[in-house]
Amino acid sequence: MPIEKEILKEIAKVIDQTNIRKDASQDEIMETCEQAKEFGFRGVCVNPEWVRLANQQLIGTDVKVICLIDPPMGTSPHQLRIQEASRVKLEGADELDVVMNIVDLKYERYFNVLGDLKEICQILPTKVIIGSGYLTDTEVRKAAELAKASGAICVKTATEKDPLGHSELAEKAKHLKIMRESAPGLLIKAAGGIKSYADLLMMREAGADIIGTSHGVEIMRELKT
């Protein structure tokens, strides 16, 4: 049975429609933006080279331009991360989805992790990606705590296109609950492998406020039929 229009709008508003394929074309990015406008998605997440185009396509709408920074492990030098974040701000990004330096996290170099993220979070509202599929439960907890301490607005499980960095949905749901407990007051974003409304609902029930997916259109069409 089709879902009521107002409920569809509420569902769309939690979706960050994502196109971070390295081989994405200009036409495909434009199509992603048009889909976001059509369905009323929360935002469009793209790689840095497409921020200017996405901004041009979405100007005058409520759809946020979100830029992915430094996948898959967040290990680029700090100054390069700052430079890229600053550049995409000038090009029209509204938010950053920034990968935490997962190597520094694993080696417990927390001072480095926190210093890097604090500076980035001063540039634009930032979601911190922790690559939960690489982490133990204890590391997920610590990563979420660091994200909160950095001034981020949100902690996120993984990137859409990093198969090693995101876990199976059941494991992801467990991590979402840990993230919620460890970073009270922050938004929680689930991404990676979310392809259907059932997947979305599972993530929402586990505590996700935002859903990152390249399958937003398919999910919305599923609900309309």
What are these regions (language model features)?
Residues 1-90, 142, 146-149:
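Conserved N-terminal beta1-alpha1 strand-loop-helix module at the mouth
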Residues 67-72, 90-105, 150-168, 193-225:
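Glycine-rich phosphate-binding active-site loops on the catalytic face of alpha/beta enzymes
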Residues 48, 52-73, 110-136, 149-150, ...:
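Alpha-helix-loop-beta-strand connector modules within alpha/beta enzyme cores
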Residues 56-58, 78-79, 108-111, 139-141, ...:
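Short secondary-structure transition/capping segments
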Residues 29, 33, 51-52, 85-86, ...:
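Generic structural signal for well-ordered alpha-helices
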Residues 55, 76-90, 135-146, 174, ...:
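Catalytic cores of alpha/beta
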Residues 11-19, 44-46, 64-70, 94-98, ...:
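Hydrophobic faces of well-ordered beta-strands that scaffold small-molecule active sites
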Residues 80, 85-86, 95-164:
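Conserved anion-binding
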